[in-house]
Amino acid sequence: MAEAGTGFLEQLKSCIVWSWTYLWTLWFFIMLFLVYILRVPLKINDNLTTVSMFLNTLTPKFYVALTGTSSLISGLILIFEWWYFRKYGTSFIEQVSVSHLRPLLGGVDNSAPSAANAANGEADSSRQSVSECKVWRNPLNLFRGAEYNRYTWVTGREPLTYYDMNLSAQDHQTFFTCDTDHLRPADAIMQKAWRERNPQARISAAHEALELNECATAYILLAEEEATTIVEAEKLFKQALKAGEGCYRRSQQLQHHGAQYEAQHRRDTNVLVYIKRRLAMCARKLGRTREAVKMMRDLMKEFPLLSMFNIHENLLEALLELQAYADVQAVLAKYDDISLPKSATICYTAALLKARAVSDKFSPEAASRRGLSTAEMNAVEAIHRAVEFNPHVPKYLLEMKSLILPPEHILKRGDSEAIAYAFFHLQHWKRVEGALNLLHCTWEGTFRMIPYPLEKGHLFYPYPICTETADRELLPSFHEVSVYPKKELPFFILFTAGLCSFTAMLALLTHQFPELMGVFAKAFLSTLFAPLNFVMEKVESILPSSLWHQLTRI
């Protein structure tokens, strides 16, 4: 019975909502009909005549002031709307309408799910947003002391944001600490050092830890932050390697004795892999590229499961420097798999290899006459695939936007990843003759294949909408963040811009040509009310005069 009563109330409520939704037009016409019938008792005609006489007595100066004031007010609204859109990415009027006015007017989504389903949907969307905007450690991140700090000394600008450095601090605590650190004094000091915000305090803590013991993580901190050259950093990393290998061998023998020993061994493994990868990067930066490639290959064979460091991206860049394109293709064959996460490095390197086969002889004029060959079509499709994954990269490769130092963390498919890729790989594209020309001729064609407005992707998942916000947190304030897709101007900005321009033009014309504008206004009003007068005359001619007389007497 209770369920039946609830169902009846729901049906009654839906009927009332339906009546308010569809019958308001009928009530509107009924009100218009009543006003027309009561026009004599209400003296509507006399009032209209009085208003028209008053308007005829107004001078052109009044209309100039009226249109000028309207133009000023709409201009102020336009300026505020534009400022709000530039700062928050949305229209203030639209936001207020959706957030406050729509609930008051009873705007309800009839297809809204139940409360439980809505909660589940919100949870799913939040999980999707988090996964889309996951921030990754930059595999090719620079050295803080030897590169980032040198940039600050020269330019006076900070290349890293607080958000980026805070993420690095969290990474260090995850990789370089464990629950048993308090049992060893040097590791206990370093555990506090990784949480310290002041760089000098971190460096002092690392020196203090080294006075107690040969601590690998202390050497890592000094190599990253205190060393002012790559040579100094390499020396410190070699000392860290010696200490780290000893800790790794000891913990490897005890890893099966308990959960604490297993956690310690995991920490020592992370430390050892990090040191060897950074040593390989030092060798690459110092010109010993073949040595760096060997170190990276050995590291990937020794620890094949530690894919979180993305060492294959370091290997790809080093192999491109050696112009070992066959080895690059072999690495891509392993990692450019549908089941593995993609990156700009993988997609654009694959495009570079296919472009290399045809770019030296490619001519857009010849291609337009004879059509694209199979190899050229494959190269263009690879470029389109790469651009769809990260549409920000081509502007940096084509030097349409200036590069900055890459951050320590990147957002895949975002501007930060594009900067990190182009910073290291621009030289490889320039080395391949005609590759940048082919990219310049074909990359914009990608956007004709992607559905708009981006409900679904073409080869990848739809482009995430949160990249701009995350990139603004990762990139310094002096860099202009690349935004995709470009935001369209809201309707109210266009409307107020048109209203401001139109009223300003009316004010100018009324001031310069008052008589002509008066004639124009009268002609416009008479034309505007001509259909209404025609309808009224037809109604009076159709209705019987006796009925019409009785209705007007009511």
UniProtKB/Swiss-Prot annotation:
Q: InterPro entries in the record, alphabetically?
A: ST7
Q: How does it sit in the membrane?
A: Multi-pass membrane protein
How is this protein named in the record? Suppressor of tumorigenicity 7 protein homolog
Q: Where in the cell is it found?
A: Membrane
Q: What keywords does the record list, in alphabetical order?
A: Membrane, Transmembrane, Transmembrane helix
Q: State which residue ranges cross the membrane.
A: 15-35, 62-82, 489-509, 516-536
Question: Known Pfam families for this protein?
Answer: ST7 (PF04184)
> Which is a Gene Ontology cellular component entry for this protein?
membrane
- Kindly indicate whether the keyword Glycosyltransferase belongs to this entry: no
The family this protein is said to belong to: Belongs to the ST7 family.
Is Transmembrane one of the keywords UniProt gives this record? yes
Protein's gene: ST7
